[in-house]
């Protein structure tokens, strides 16, 4: 056979196969685009494990019609302009391949609008060909809907796993983003049902505790700078392990990466028995000029300019912080089961630290209390314990779309609406909620058997912010704490930990 140039359509299909392996990679590329578009709310919807559909909607900056048409062409990007830019990449995408590859091997719909546009642009695409361009309505942002992945590559289509396995891979891919971007609201639905809903959190560690529940049994957090690197992490104590590497997450400059080198460092420091693995979420920040992210189209493999420096710094950081094992394993044990008020405790001196924490001297050591977490739990329990909730009128114009059944369920808990179903105006809300909290609550809520708990959870946003507690509020909360013996806030974070005098003596080698 003579050598000849391949048709452009075939070249594009081959390139698409290198970037898009299964529905989870569609999800990955679309979420990365949303994050690069400065979205702070991203909704991922999949059907049949993503084999039928993957849809990602965001509230980012959107695209004009011209930009949308350009975005589906290969090697078009807004992230880099020159070869030099490859050495200082800060965005998730940069190759200009993802969207073009996706639309080559699927039936896709793109709806996008910028803040300046009066109407949104809608593109209908099949196998890389634009079949329809029209205008429609939507808020600023972008929705990309991908259906029938690999419909024009039957062998690849047939090689997809079962719907259950593809769903698991999509969820795992989704969680990689949720862990690193605590500044973004994430929602994940499968076949019309909400599977995950993660509101923004104060820090990355809170997100990790929400997703990786086994971390709560014992963990260590740290944040350090050394040798020009910034290393931050939340890792399990040596007693908390898994039988596989599923709890291992490495991020370099905010990008999830797979790295055997970093894995080896982690395993070396933990020195666990065979087939035991720690749970670890590690974030490494390096100078972009000392990092090559252009190793593979998937962008999950990176190469460090000075790999030994990175490995040594990570090893030192992990060793230093895991040496505090005695502290954390003691720190997150359950507090004494005796119900004491602060005044009744044998030793009740306490003081406030930075408006965030209370340090209480108890009989056998020091008790540290996170006042914000305690206040959240106090509000949550108080609301749940009420048999009926009072109402107050809403001053703003808040509209929500509800079915008749959803409306009736919400009315049982203090809401009232104008209208019977469909787009309803909120007239009254439970007395303990603010209008800001209600607007956020209605952005994403399932009306289910846990509705009362969800409303109470929304009310937790009314807790005094960390750093703003005074001694009067702290004293009242400590009384509640010693009477109720709360262990965790409604989100699962620990409220307190105790250091015994015996452990202090051991640490100082007395």
UniProtKB/Swiss-Prot annotation:
UniProt superkingdom: Bacteria
One Gene Ontology cellular component annotation held by this UniProt entry: mismatch repair complex
Entry keywords, A to Z: DNA damage, DNA repair
Keyword Phosphoprotein: no
MF annotations from Gene Ontology: ATP binding; ATP hydrolysis activity; ATP-dependent DNA damage sensor activity; mismatched DNA binding
PROSITE patterns, A to Z: DNA_MISMATCH_REPAIR_1
Annotated SMART domains: DNA_mis_repair, MutL_C
Record InterPro entries: DNA_mismatch_repair_CS (IPR014762), DNA_mismatch_repair_MutL (IPR020667), DNA_mismatch_S5_2-like (IPR013507), HATPase_C_sf (IPR036890), MutL/Mlh/PMS (IPR002099), MutL/Mlh/Pms-like (IPR038973), MutL_C (IPR014790), MutL_C_dimsub (IPR042120)
Pfam families: DNA_mis_repair, HATPase_c_3, MutL_C
GO BP term (any one): mismatch repair
Keyword DNA repair: yes
Function, as annotated: This protein is involved in the repair of mismatches in DNA. It is required for dam-dependent methyl-directed DNA mismatch repair. May act as a 'molecular matchmaker', a protein that promotes the formation of a stable complex between two or more DNA-binding proteins in an ATP-dependent manner without itself being part of a final effector complex.
Protein family membership: Belongs to the DNA mismatch repair MutL/HexB family.
Name of this protein: DNA mismatch repair protein MutL
Organism from which the protein derives: Thermotoga maritima (strain ATCC 43589 / DSM 3109 / JCM 10099 / NBRC 100826 / MSB8)
């Amino acid at each position: 056979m003579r050598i000849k140039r391949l048709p452009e359509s075939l070249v594009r299909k081959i390139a698409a196969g290198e970037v898009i392996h299964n529905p989870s990679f569609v999800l990955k590329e679309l979420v990365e685009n949303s994050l690069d578009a400065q979205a702070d709310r991203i909704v991922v919807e999949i059907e049949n494990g993503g084999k039928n559909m993957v849809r990602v909607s965001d509230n980012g900056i959107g695209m004009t019609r011209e930009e949308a048409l350009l975005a589906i062409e290969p090697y078009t990007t807004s992230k880099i302009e020159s070869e030099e830019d490859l050495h200082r990449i800060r965005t998730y995408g940069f190759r200009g391949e993802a969207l073009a590859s996706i639309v080559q091997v699927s039936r896709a719909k793109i709806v996008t609008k910028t803040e300046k546009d009066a109407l949104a642009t809608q593109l209908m695409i099949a196998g890389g060909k634009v079949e329809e361009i029209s205008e429609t309505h939507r808020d600023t942002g972008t929705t990309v809907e991908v259906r029938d992945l690999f419909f024009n590559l039957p062998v690849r289509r047939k090689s997809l796993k079962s719907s259950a396995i593809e769903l698991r891979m999509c969820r795992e891919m989704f969680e990689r983003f949720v862990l690193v971007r605590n500044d973004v609201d994430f929602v994940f639905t499968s076949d019309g049902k909400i599977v995950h809903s993660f509101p923004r959190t104060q820090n990355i560690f809170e997100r990790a505790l929400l997703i990786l529940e086994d971390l709560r049994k014992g963990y260590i957090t740290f944040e350090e700078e050394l040798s020009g690197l910034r290393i931050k992490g939340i890792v399990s104590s040596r007693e908390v392990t898994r039988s596989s590497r599923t709890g291992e997450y490495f991020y370099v400059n905010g990008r999830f990466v797979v790295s055997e080198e970093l894995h080896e460092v982690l395993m070396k420091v933990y020195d666990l028995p065979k087939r035991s693995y720690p749970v670890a979420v590690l974030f490494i920040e390096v100078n972009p000029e000392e990092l090559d992210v252009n190793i593979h189209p998937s962008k999950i493999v990176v190469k460090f300019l000075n790999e030994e420096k990175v490995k040594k710094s990570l090893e030192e950081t992990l060793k230093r912080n895991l040496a505090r094992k005695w502290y954390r394993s003691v720190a997150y044990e359950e507090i004494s089961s005796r119900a004491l008020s602060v005044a009744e405790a044998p030793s009740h001196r306490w003081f406030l630290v930075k408006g965030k924490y209370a340090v209480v001297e108890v009989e056998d050591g020091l008790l540290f209390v996170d006042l914000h977490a305690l206040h959240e739990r106090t509000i949550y329990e108080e609301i749940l314990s009420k048999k009926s909730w009072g109402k107050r009128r809403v001053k703003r114009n808040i509209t929500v779309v509800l079915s008749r059944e959803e409306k009736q369920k919400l009315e049982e808990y203090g809401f009232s609406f104008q209208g019977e179903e469909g787009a309803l105006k909120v007239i009254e809300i439970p007395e303990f909620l603010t209008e800001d909290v209600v607007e956020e609550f209605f952005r994403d809520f399932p009306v289910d058997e846990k509705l009362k708990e969800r409303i109470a959870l929304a009310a937790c946003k009314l807790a005094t912010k960390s750093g703003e507690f005074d001694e009067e509020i702290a004293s009242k909360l400590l009384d509640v704490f010693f009477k109720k013996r709360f262990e965790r806030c409604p989100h699962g974070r620990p409220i307190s930990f105790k250091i015994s005098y015996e452990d202090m003596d051991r640490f100082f080698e007395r």
